[in-house]
From Swiss-Prot:
One of the components of the core complex of photosystem II (PSII). PSII is a light-driven water:plastoquinone oxidoreductase that uses light energy to abstract electrons from H(2)O, generating O(2) and a proton gradient subsequently used for ATP formation. It consists of a core antenna complex that captures photons, and an electron transfer chain that converts photonic excitation into a charge separation. Required for assembly and/or stability of PSII. Keywords: Chloroplast, Membrane, Photosynthesis, Photosystem II, Plastid, Reaction center, Thylakoid, Transmembrane, Transmembrane helix. InterPro entries: PSII_PsbK (IPR003687), PSII_PsbK_sf (IPR037270). This is Photosystem II reaction center protein K.
Amino acid sequence: MTTLALVLAKLPEAYAPFAPIVDVLPVIPVFFILLAFVWQAAVSFR
């Protein structure tokens, strides 16, 4: 049980280098919505 607690405690340190990537992730769906508008503008909203 204590081993599991130690592993869980180490996880945030292990993922620390990825923090900047995680900060950007919520913005990705917005890019897809913008892409949809650009695509429709390119095909003249058929």
